[in-house]
Amino acid sequence: MGVALGYGIAAAVETGKPVIAIEGDSGFGFDGMEVETICRYKLPITIVVINNGGIYNGDKNPVKDQLGPTVLSHSAHYGEIATAFGGNSYRVNNYTEMKKALDEAYASGKPTVIDAQIPISMGKESGHIGNLNPQLNLDPAKNK
């Protein structure tokens, strides 16, 4: 998690061709500042951030105003980091908007971040870190 942009930079530098890097919002949290490098060197990389508001999915069962440790802000505008460094930014909510953003990003040849909003219910909780989410009960006997 969080290696897509490093691989994207390597692919763009090695081939000189446009690259599409796809990662989730949590992964982007690890390597998002690589957008500065991508913009500084004007690499033709389009980053698609799948934004569902969490490591696996957003907070479906909040307790009062406290979010679980695997929850991120679904309202974050991840594309704005590209704008800050001179790249392009799109926020999309459906297939038509995604296709348009990808077409425009490819045609521009500029570094681009596409913030792809998906429902917070999409994704799957991992049994390996599920115990970090206090709202999740991983006891199979209790989930029947």
Identify the role of each PLM range.
Residues 1-144:
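Thiamine diphosphate
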